[in-house]
């Protein structure tokens, strides 16, 4: 199980002036609110934690579509063990902050990377055996030129065509229920795909299972 989420840190709805006075109480646990109050950069941390919650929720939904998003009940705790390796992430992104996240009893490892203007989170089930993780993020100068959904699918196909050594025309992304599915030459690929967009950013992540394991 994987999930990814991107937050445009410069989007108007990400600014403090646009935020409801009770947003933090509704979105974060008591421990997380303490982290925000004591952080040297609470604004950035707020959206790092939010992206961690969203990415883990998306991963949990893959396991059970009945899972609902109640952010204040999604606990995010700093994790100083292990690391999630991103393949294809921009070099200007920082090394990432790792968290452990619990959603409806399901546990996830999450890494959030912050670049110039965005926070990008990637969540994996804590007990998953994952082979390769690919991810990509792109800034779209004019999001009115095409739908964000079309843009993020284009990004994912460009990333995975290179990884799989297939021409982009051989790849397609379809929906099965609410989940994206990658097909290669018309056949479902044994990969788990997650798509995300917010503001001027689109992002994707894809996991291949480890040999003898599940992703």
Identify the role of each PLM range.
Residues 1-215:
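Core catalytic alpha/beta fold that binds nucleotide/phospho-ligands
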